[in-house]
Each structure stands twice: as C-alpha cells, then as structure tokens.
Amino acid sequence: MTIQGLVLGHFEQCEVRKISARDTNKFVLLCDGTQAPFVSVVEIFDEGGQTPPNEHAEAFEYFYVLEGEGTAIVGEAETDIRKGSFFVVPPGNNHQVRNTGAGRLYVLTTMVPDEKFSDLIKAGPAASLDEEDLRVLSGARPAGAGTFA
C-alpha cells in the first residue's frame, strides 16, 4: 500500500452504512483500508442494539465511547462502559458491544489491520444520520445545556 499524502475529511462527507438491513448499529466510515492499513469508524448503536459476538484473526480493535452507556464483553469478562471509557481487544478474542443505556451509544472504533472489515461495511446497505447523530458527532450541546444561572 502506498499512501500518497494526508488523509483528511469530515464526518458529514463520510459513507454511513449498516452491514445488513436488520442490524441495530450503523457505521460512519471515517477511514478505510484503501486510505490506510486500518479502518476507523464511528459505530452508532440504537437503544438495545449490539454487535454479534465476533473475533479477528490478526487485528487489534480499539473502542472509545463518545456518548451513551453500554457493556463490553471480551471472552468471559463483562464490564460497563460509558462516555470516556475505552478498551482494546487483542486478536483472537471473542467480543461484543451492547447498548444498555437510554438513547443511542456512539463508539469510535479502530481496527488495525483492517482485515477487510471496511469492505464488509461498504458492501452493506446505505444508512443516514439524523439530528441526534449530527448533534453528538459535531459536539453540539442540546439547547440549555452547559449554561449557568
């Protein structure tokens, strides 16, 4: 792979997809295997949504919670996650992420190497971002939030 220069973008110009139409999570594809030797996405889980249990032969997978609450399951270990939590899953470990909170769960996920995960995402149906997604991803605060009397 030859990387010609800086990879730069904005989430509003990125593809948004699901792996399958029935999935309870969607992906904002920030950077894929054609741009760098890894994939980076914002994974958005609907309330009650989850990934299927899965593992990767070679890839390390890094998760950082941007918003919401959930559970990370790695092997037999299960732990609560919330905004600011992060965890790394080494290759060969079965893992799953579940949204257990009220509202959506937003997770920045990076997988190194890509292991063709970006191809799997790009082969799925298109999805879209709604107002709540745009608010969370842009860092905007809801009306009245962060004000002091």
Give the predicted meaning of each segment.
Residues 58-59, 77, 93-94, 103, ...:
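A generic "binding-loop/recognition-motif" signal
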Residues 42, 88, 103-120:
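A short hydrophobic beta-strand segment most commonly corresponding to one strand
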Residues 76-91:
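Short acidic-glycine-tyrosine-enriched beta hairpin
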Residues 58-60, 64-70:
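Glycine- and acidic-residue-biased ligand/ion/polar-headgroup-sensing regions
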Residues 1-38, 122-149:
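A short, N-terminal "cap"/entry segment at the start of jelly-roll beta-barrel domains
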Residues 25, 41-56:
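Conserved short histidine dyad/triad with adjacent acidic residue
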Residues 52-54, 72-73, 89, 95-101:
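Short beta-strand His + acidic residue motifs that chelate non-heme Fe in jelly-roll/DSBH
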